[in-house]
Amino acid sequence: MSGQFTSQAAQRPRSATILIVEDDMDIGVFLQQAIDEETPYQTTVVSDGPHALEKAQQLHPCLLLLDYRLPGMNGLEIYDRLQQMEETRGIPAIMMSAHLPIEELKPRGIYPLYKPMDIGNVIRMITHALAPFEQKRSPESAWIV
């Protein structure tokens, strides 16, 4: 497994990047295609923690979509490491798994997303998680005092 791939749809000019961290490439491709089709966001998929840390520093994504159970380091460990770095601190995150440690997600402000996933719920969760980001980017918000 190469550790990362980017869809052709993600190569067109888009507004911002969602970093998907998922070791099951079938799920990664499914999420990437759905997000590319249903949102204005570019997506990049990586399959493990080291690639996630590297790509997050390079891309400065607007959102992290993290699988909880990953080889080597879990999604929470990735999130915590990114929060320790100034350039990636504060990136909102959605954590995916069949079994999530809700008591650890809540204090971090991480949104829970249970597998198996309904793509409609995934898109709604992304929209909700990115509402503050979109509000800041909106030209109208520059005029709000």
Region locations from a protein language model:
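A Lys-centered signature of the CheY-like receiver
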Residues: 115
